[in-house]
A protein has these predicted regions:
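Terminal intrinsically disordered/low-complexity segments used for targeting and assembly
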Residues: 2-80, 239-284, 458-465
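Short, acidic/charged, Gly/Pro-enriched secondary-structure junctions
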Residues: 86-104, 113-115, 297
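Sec/SRP-type N-terminal targeting helices
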Residues: 86-87, 103-104, 140-171, 219, ...
Length: 465
């Protein structure tokens, strides 16, 4: 009866250990995640963008999206010299080295240390001894500790590569946005230059009419002069913004701050019809989302490692020593000694360290899962924002174009009326100010549309190719 009970206990323990081994050797599988509704519909009744799940906009090579040769040259320079990208590449090298070490941990380790002594007792003949020991140790991975560590190192390498791709995409989008910012500022500077001349002419005309006593008072001349100075202030601000943007772009492409050669805003050709791709395609394209999932996988294997530490560890060590007995030198060089030891260690009480380690690993897994979920939601939000920004800026630009046509005619009409003294100076100044502000706003909205395209491309994982 006692033997039967012992047999049942042994079988039960063996079954529990085998079931535990199965879970310890398990591979990471992607948890369920909600992908429907990640991208919100655009707010316009008639969609300007073609949103479907065909070939995604983010899969297009960046050279096909940004066709300006000057911009392409700046992007190439950034990819070669940007410090964040260079550091990301070094992170990949470090992860590769760690993975190599994790793979080699399955093999035995060997150590060699030689030792020799010369001794003489009471002035007698010197005695020479030497030993050439080789020690080997092998940690047998019975319960997946080394395997989980290796798999964790593998996903860390993938995470490092994903981070490198994410930085690359961010750099490409950053260069494009700054380049287009410079083009916008150049066009605004051109508009301000034209308005500077117009307001100066208006001021001169009012001075002449005041001197000729043709119905223009000093207050009108002063207002025209102030309007002219306001334009000069705007010009100074734009010049400062150009210099600051050039400095930022120079830093991004890894060079000293200097002037940036560039094209013109009106010559830029960017896509106007897109397929965004949704759901899992969005998850696969976004390098930062995939990196967050690889962090989740790493934490999964860390939990496996923490669990495996509760199980016994098998260590096998061996040593071989070539030695002599001393004094006989080369004639009888010595003998070879062998020794082998195997040990099985079962943790019983480790001051709560094993339980604490498992709890920490599980908590880190939950944190990684939350971060992954947030990365998914952030990706969807960025796509939605880019779509809304594109449609909104396009709609505003069309309205402002009509408004500019009206204001240009208004400026011409007020100039003619002022010549015949049939309007006030205030109407003239107001018409000029309204025209300039609307023209500047239209340029800003045109830039916002270009920026939305860049942001949409980046939000869909563009820049990896």
């Amino acid at each position: 009866m006692k033997n039967k009970i012992n047999t049942i206990l042994v079988l039960t323990l063996a079954t529990l250990m085998l079931s535990g081994c199965k879970s310890l050797y398990g591979r990471y599988e992607r948890p369920d995640v909600k992908t429907t509704g990640l991208v919100r519909d655009v707010m316009s009744d008639k969609d300007t963008l073609v949103v479907n799940d065909t070939a995604g906009f983010g899969n297009i090579p960046w050279r096909s999206v940004f066709t300006d040769p000057i911009l392409q040259g700046l992007i190439h320079q950034a990819l070669d010299h940007n410090t964040d990208l260079l550091n990301a590449a070094l992170n990949v090298k470090m992860a590769e080295a760690q993975l190599t070490a994790a793979k080699l941990s399955f093999l035995p380790s060997f150590n060699f240390s030689s030792q020799g002594t010369i001794s003489s007792w009471d002035g007698g003949k010197a005695s020479k001894t030497y030993s050439l020991p080789v020690n080997a140790a092998w940690n047998v991975d019975l319960f997946g500790t080394l395997l989980s560590s290796k798999r964790a190192a593998q996903v860390v390498l993938l995470q490092s590569k994903d981070y490198q791709v994410a930085v690359r995409a961010k750099v490409i989008a950053g260069v494009a946005n700054m380049y287009y910012t410079l083009l916008m500022l150049d066009k605004q500077m051109q508009l301000v230059d034209d308005m500077e001349q117009l307001t100066k002419d208006t001021w001169e005309i009012m001075k002449l009419r005041k001197d000729a006593a043709v119905g223009v008072r000093s207050v009108a001349v002063q207002s025209a002069e102030a309007n002219y100075y306001s334009v000069l202030v705007q010009k100074t601000d734009i010049r400062r913004q150009i210099r600051e943007t050039e400095n930022s772009l120079s830093l991004l492409i890894g060079q000293q701050a200097q002037a940036i050669t560039r094209g013109k805003m009106d010559d830029q050709l960017l896509p106007t019809s897109f397929s965004t791709g949704v759901g899992l395609r969005l998850l696969n394209n976004r390098a930062d989302v995939h990196a967050a999932e690889m962090k989740l996988a790493q934490c999964f294997y860390n939990v496996q490692t923490a669990r495996s530490r509760f199980y016994p560890g098998l260590n096998i060590s061996a040593s071989g020593t070539y030695t002599n007995s001393g004094g006989r030198g080369i004639v009888n060089p010595g003998s070879l000694l062998w020794r082998a030891v195997g040990s099985l260690t079962q943790p019983i009480f480790q001051n709560g360290r094993l339980i604490a380690g498992l709890k920490v690993a599980k908590a880190q897994y939950e944190q990684a899962y939350n971060s992954w979920q947030n990365a998914i939601l952030t990706a969807g939000s960025e796509v939605s924002n880019a779509l809304v920004k594109y449609n909104s800026s396009l709609e505003k630009s069309k309205i402002e174009e009509k408004k500019i046509d009206v204001l240009k005619k208004n400026v011409e009409d007020t100039k003619e009326l002022m010549a015949s003294s049939r309007t006030t100076y205030l109407e003239v100044i107001t018409a000029q100010s309204s025209l300039l502000n609307t023209e500047l706003a239209k340029v800003a909205d045109d830039f916002a549309r270009m920026q939305a395209i860049v942001n949409l491309y980046s939000a869909l994982g563009g820049g990896a190719k």
